[in-house]
Swiss-Prot record:
Transit peptide interval: 1-28, 29-66
Protein name: Photosystem II stability/assembly factor HCF136, chloroplastic
Gene Ontology, cellular component aspect: chloroplast thylakoid lumen; photosystem II
UniProt superkingdom: Eukaryota
Thylakoid among keywords: yes
Main subcellular location: plastid
Organism encoding this protein: Guillardia theta (Cryptophyte)
Role of this protein: Essential for photosystem II (PSII) biogenesis; required for assembly of an early intermediate in PSII assembly that includes D2 (psbD) and cytochrome b559.
């Protein structure tokens, strides 16, 4: 049953910089954190990695693009899968990086160096079971979600975090959260439930009347190919700056859209025989269009000014790019001309003319690790996240 709202009481403190912990790590690096002794304990594995990684800095290569831009491998004290990165200030100096095995890293120099952070009231072995997948900030207010189901909230840029209890009646698992400021956030689950809180997670109000599964049961005769194979979950949920959403069915058979004010998600048929692999808003703007990647390396973009209220499928135009059959996992449309894509096999391509011509970035595919996510925090600074603690920085 889909619930319209739920109440969460007693936010639990997770960790705070105002406590004194077991280890002073100030002497271990040259980063700009001035008072490491006020931070929290570091488990054995993270501590050993943190001791070793400065000695390897000189071994990390730089990959140069024809336009004198470059991607540089950032040394990290972890070997986990990295899922998301976010900064708390307009200058993009102070930020957080999250991933599997309880990975929670902090930077104060724009992403050049990262320091591991550990929750003070969680056992180190327990923390390693968490997989932090998404982080979002609006000013100094931030939110983190992960699996097993967990929601964290901060109102001071990450100095102190609180754990928000997750209702056992929540349809699906949290998969995306967007900080809105003033103790507000929007939470989406793998079942298509969307909730908004205006009091730091104590209460949540549903924005849709039913889950995607229920919607498809009503519209199964609508002609949406693949809807009958829906497993009940969606992947790759994307929200743009206007609060509009895209979501892909777990099999990639079709996609769905939602915008504020609608009672349910609208399923839409794909226009190709290949399954959808990934989607996103171009420059995070609904008016710019949508991009879609399909299995085997297909890439297309929609026409502009499409109607989210219409039940018709959107029109897409193919972009000619030869990836050698490698699937396109993510894309970043930095501006009207500059496009970056990451593919299977650790391959990165760049176009500076709206996708007419593409250049492969040499050397990145030689690194140990797969690439999963590319994110530009502004027009001049971007990051690529991958497995084995692989983080690439562009500036």
């Amino acid at each position: 049953m889909f619930i319209n709202s739920f109440c969460l009481k007693n936010l639990l403190p997770v960790f705070s910089k105002n406590k004194t912990f077991l280890l002073n790590v100030k002497c271990l690096s040259n980063n700009k954190f001035e008072n490491h002794s006020n931070f929290f304990k570091i488990n054995r594995t993270k501590f050993i990695n943190y001791l070793l990684y400065p000695t390897l800095t000189s071994l990390y290569p730089k990959f140069t693009h024809a336009n004198t831009t470059s991607w540089t491998k950032v040394d990290l004290p972890v070997d986990s899968v990295l899922f998301d990165i976010e900064f708390t200030d307009p200058e993009c100096k102070h930020g957080w990086l999250v991933g599997s095995k309880g990975t929670f890293l902090e930077t104060d120099d724009g992403g050049n160096t990262w320091v591991p952070r550990t929750f003070a009231n969680l056992d180190p072995d327990e923390e390693l079971t968490y997989r932090f997948e998404n982080i979002s900030f609006e000013g100094q207010e931030g939110w983190v979600i992960g699996k097993p189901a967990i929601i964290l909230y901060t109102k001071d840029g990450g100095k102190t975090w609180f754990r928000v209890p997750v209702s056992p009646k929540l349809p699906g698992e949290p998969c995306l959260i967007k900080a809105l400021g003033s103790e507000s956030a929007e939470l989406t689950t793998t079942s298509g439930a969307i909730y908004v809180t205006n009091n730091a997670g104590r209460n949540w109000k549903a924005q849709v009347k039913e889950t995607i599964d229920s919607t498809l049961n009503r519209t199964i005769s609508s002609g949406v190919s693949g809807a009958s194979y829906f497993t009940g979950n969606v992947i790759n949920v994307i929200r743009n700056s206007e609060g509009k959403y895209l979501a892909i069915s777990s099999r990639g058979n079709f996609y769905l859209t939602w915008e504020p004010g609608q009672d349910f998600w609208i399923p839409r048929a794909r226009e190709t025989s290949r399954r959808i692999q990934s989607m996103g808003f171009i420059q995070n703007d609904n008016q710019k269009g949508i991009w879609m990647s399909t299995r085997g390396g297909g890439l297309s973009v929609s026409t502009k000014n499409f109607d989210f209220e219409s039940i018709s499928s959107f029109n897409f135009e193919n972009i000619d790019i030869k990836t050698g059959g490698y699937g396109i996992l993510d894309a970043a449309f930095v501006n009207d001309k500059d496009i970056w894509i990451i593919c299977g096999g650790g391959i990165v391509y760049n176009s500076t003319d709206k996708g007419k011509n593409w250049t492969k970035v040499d050397g990145i595919d030689k690194l140990s690790g797969n690439l999963y996510k590319i994110k530009f925090v502004n027009n001049n600074k971007g990051f690529i996240l991958g497995s084995n603690g692989l983080l690439l920085r562009y500036q």
